[in-house]
């Protein structure tokens, strides 16, 4: 049986006027049960969950909206919603990574790198070297001529005892520095390269 949208919206407004968020959410939920692609109503539910302090539920609701936007190719809208989630739950690395991916889709390289770097730092704090290295690798591939990223990745590989991969990254960084005529920096990186690849 079809839901009468105007009646449901009217009932939700009445509950809101009384400050009864749970009942208003229940009314809006009826609309999305009938039409799961009703993004505006999902956003309204997320907003109400936020107002009542249910940040985990709100984040999950917003995540659903952001994924819908991303699937539809509305990357800017997805970015806005992912940022909303991070305001509620700043430590959500899964959301930070999706935000960085959206920046990549929008070709906003510096924003993507900054967001990836924050995630890499968080993984390092958790002692999760594997995920940290994966993110640094992604950053190096995203902006191959970014010398600080390459060197940071090389140092992380060195720390993880991945000597040959570290040497390759130091070599790439040294080559870029040499091309730019930055001789002092080149010599420092070349020294690190020789440490990893003697002879």
Residue ranges of model-derived segments:
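Repeat-based scaffolding regions
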Residues: 1-199
């Amino acid at each position: 049986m079809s839901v009468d949208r105007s009646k449901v919206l009217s009932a939700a407004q009445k509950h809101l006027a009384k400050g009864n968020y749970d009942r208003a959410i229940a009314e809006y939920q009826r609309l999305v049960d009938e039409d799961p692609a009703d993004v505006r109503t999902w956003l309204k539910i997320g907003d109400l969950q936020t107002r009542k302090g249910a940040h985990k539920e709100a984040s999950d609701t917003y995540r659903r909206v952001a994924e819908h936007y991303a699937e539809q190719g509305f990357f800017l809208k997805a970015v806005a919603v992912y940022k909303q989630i991070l305001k509620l739950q700043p430590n959500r690395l899964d959301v930070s990574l999706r935000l960085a991916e959206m920046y990549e889709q929008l070709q906003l390289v510096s924003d993507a790198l900054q967001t990836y770097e924050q995630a890499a730092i968080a993984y390092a704090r958790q002692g999760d070297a594997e995920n940290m290295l994966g993110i640094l690798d992604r950053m190096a591939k995203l902006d191959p001529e970014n010398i600080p990223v390459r060197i940071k990745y090389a140092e992380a590989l060195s720390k993880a005892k991945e000597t040959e991969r570290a040497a390759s990254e130091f070599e790439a960084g040294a080559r870029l520095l040499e091309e730019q005529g930055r001789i002092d920096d080149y010599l420092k990186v070349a020294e690190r390269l020789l440490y990893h690849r003697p002879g």
